[in-house]
Amino acid sequence: MLMPKRVKYRKNHLPHIKGKETRGLKLAFGDYGIQAVGRGYVDSRMIESCRVIMAKNIGKTGKYWIRIFPDVAWTKKPLEVRMGGGKGDPEKWIFPVKPGRIMFELTGVDEDTAKHIARLIGFRLPFEVRLISRV
């Protein structure tokens, strides 16, 4: 699972996910990209399940890139603990996604396979995604 090796601060405020994305809007590596239409937080387990889908469906000739990295700590207090006593411990690592962000890129596959992969990835993310192409 993806997580940072070292962080300056263990606990941080959650970033706002209002508005549209201003970075990561264009394809940088592959011929096809999976772009977020909605907004939400993606954790490292979701990214790993998407990676497994791409690895299984691309084959030996294709290649994929993961353009997001979870570097924000998501904290949670234990169950049945009263309020107060400070912020909870980090539970998982997340990446805030705004509409327009390209999260994954693919190359070496035909358009039907890319559409199939985008559909499968859409089932595993908490917001809507779409396939974009360089052509």
Swiss-Prot record:
GO cellular component terms listed in the entry, alphabetical order: cytosolic large ribosomal subunit
InterPro entries the record matches: Ribosomal_uL16, Ribosomal_uL16_bact-type, Ribosomal_uL16_CS, Ribosomal_uL16_dom, Ribosomal_uL16_sf
An individual GO BP term: translation
Transmembrane residue ranges: none
Tree of life domain: Bacteria
Gene3D superfamilies found in the cross-reference section: Ribosomal protein L10e/L16 (3.90.1170.10)
Ranges in coiled-coil conformation: none
Record keywords, A-Z: Ribonucleoprotein, Ribosomal protein, RNA-binding, rRNA-binding, tRNA-binding
Pfam families in alphabetical order: Ribosomal_L16
Gene Ontology terms for molecular function: rRNA binding; structural constituent of ribosome; tRNA binding
Family per similarity comment: Belongs to the universal ribosomal protein uL16 family.
UniProt xrefs under NCBIfam families: rplP_bact (TIGR01164)
Oligomeric and partner information: Part of the 50S ribosomal subunit.
Functional note: Binds 23S rRNA and is also seen to make contacts with the A and possibly P site tRNAs.
PANTHER family documented for this protein: 50S/60S RIBOSOMAL PROTEIN L16 (PTHR12220), LARGE RIBOSOMAL SUBUNIT PROTEIN UL16M (PTHR12220:SF13)
Protein name: Large ribosomal subunit protein uL16
Species per Swiss-Prot/TrEMBL record: Coprothermobacter proteolyticus (strain ATCC 35245 / DSM 5265 / OCM 4 / BT)
Gene: rplP
